[in-house]
């Protein structure tokens, strides 16, 4: 435990106290003593309600467990549904309504586009994500498997003109589809010019043409006769054709086009939750300081690449001339949301009555809002929100009472920081079963400030398993994706959001593409999320954001949502279909395969979390395919094994043998990392290995199947152990 400062009824870790006083409070318009006094009062007032809500979760889970035990082998759906209603799990639905959120930025309300999620503990990644508002299509195609390596088009270590030609052809095909010419093809273009406020394209034969829809031309840079950039707009997203006949690529292009740059990640969630490992005051200050640097606009990251020292910083805005001679300024950066933690965890950064740790979600709400306030009052290089709003994503809430508590918390924070009511907007993660089933009521509780709902398959599956742990053995992990409840959950989220008036006002988001190396497959599959009604979906990298942007040019999301707005189906009965296997017929080989896959996944993620404090990373799976892993993937993997153990599908000895065998595989996969600490053969001495064991063997008793309590405790243990070794 570090040093603390007493401020009224709370003790604040000195590292946090100094950061807030020296960096956040100056120029905030707030008095230091009053800030800490108000903070202490807020903690005292809201902590009892937070505890009540957590106790309610436990009470409901106990009732569910008892009911399933009593009805094992004689499950009746109508009885089950009546029981859920009796215990308040299924809430009486509110009357129809529409959300009334105002001062929402266009990136949320108007533009449909990709969304990045990035850990705030990594400044370089966070900067890359903020800058991913614009991305090179040529780089994204050339550097990934989106373009095949057949017929001499290998990536190689130096520029391959065969591959380059394929990239250019792909780019022209895209232009023909998104912004077609009135006659001819963009492939025929030898010059782009602006004449009398119109885009004029000259072809190989000397003919000229314009855009089929001239209004899609919105700006340019350089001389009208020889522009260096032509700005087009389709389905609300911008496309920039960059022209430079001296450039290595431009030289080879008959129109001098060196690149096609796409508006890509229009929004980014700067994450202080599932993708970070922040277990104490020092870790939390790193999260907050990086967020403050992003908001102020002065965050930088220095790193070595190919033997050169590189410095990353935020991109400036982009300035264009408009067709009528005016000026157009477009944001150079993604609109930032910040994800706070949920209601469960506490943190030792602040202690209150009897030395109790503060609920981390309460602390996050106050400090991240204080940070974002600086952007609203002109203390920053760039504006984040042009509408004067703060965007906070709130995860892992169960039912409408918990959402109402978040609303009360945000009310109190606004009053404390001198912000107008509903300045703080909320994004509600629909990732817990009790929220999915009562989503309309949840939205109603924040109808004046909601800007986002989002489905998250992984956390939601973890909760699905844990909620019905006593119902029987669950489907294998990969079979969950085609289960009845999951299909209904995805459809219901869209239907409820649209019925509540989200179209043109708020985001309806869908989940992560977890395979950052498999971009060709992403291009084939991820467009389906837009056809299902999403106006944003998660991507794992800036490159993936650029490629996913192509889908938004192919699909007019606003039109899709108009069609789906008539969907008044009630999906709740299908969502209540428990993914249990009544008479499992799995072979011994199939069971072992499931154990191998899940144990390897757990160990690969946990070893970096516990030993190195890395909360999100690309972890090779058992087939060496890199998968983006965070706490959500860990929750489902650990809960499926806890469920199978509980129902005798496998034994503890079998799981332990698998863990030890897979630890050797993970050790080999990490052999190139100089900071890596092997788990084998001294398993008892590896805090990371023991954490993985806890997550499985104690998975039944974890609150709602969450992994944070074990991870935090074991990470603190590892930090203390490594510090003692170094002394």
Swiss-Prot record:
One GO cellular component term: cytosol
Cofactors named for this entry: Mg(2+)
The keyword Transferase belongs to this UniProt entry's keyword annotation: yes
Binding, glyoxylate: 339, 431, 456-459
Pathway participation: Carbohydrate metabolism; glyoxylate cycle; (S)-malate from isocitrate: step 2/2
Catalytic activity, reaction form: glyoxylate + acetyl-CoA + H2O = (S)-malate + CoA + H(+)
Residue positions where Cysteine sulfenic acid (-SOH) is found in the record: 616
Main location: cytoplasm
The protein's enzyme class: transferase
Entry GO MF terms: magnesium ion binding; malate synthase activity
Compartments, record wording: Cytoplasm
Pfam families associated with the record: MS_C, MS_N, MS_TIM-barrel, MSG_insertion
EC nos: 2.3.3.9
Binding annotation for acetyl-CoA: 117, 124-125, 275, 312, 540
Catalytic machinery residues: 339 (proton acceptor), 630 (proton donor)
Domain of life: Bacteria
Matching NCBIfam families: malate_syn_G, PRK02999.1
Family of this protein: Belongs to the malate synthase family. GlcB subfamily.
Function: Involved in the glycolate utilization. Catalyzes the condensation and subsequent hydrolysis of acetyl-coenzyme A (acetyl-CoA) and glyoxylate to form malate and CoA.
Quaternary organization: Monomer.
Name under which the protein is recorded: Malate synthase G
Organism for this UniProt entry: Geobacillus kaustophilus (strain HTA426)
Taxonomic lineage from the root: Bacteria, Bacillati, Bacillota, Bacilli, Bacillales
Gene name linked to the record: glcB
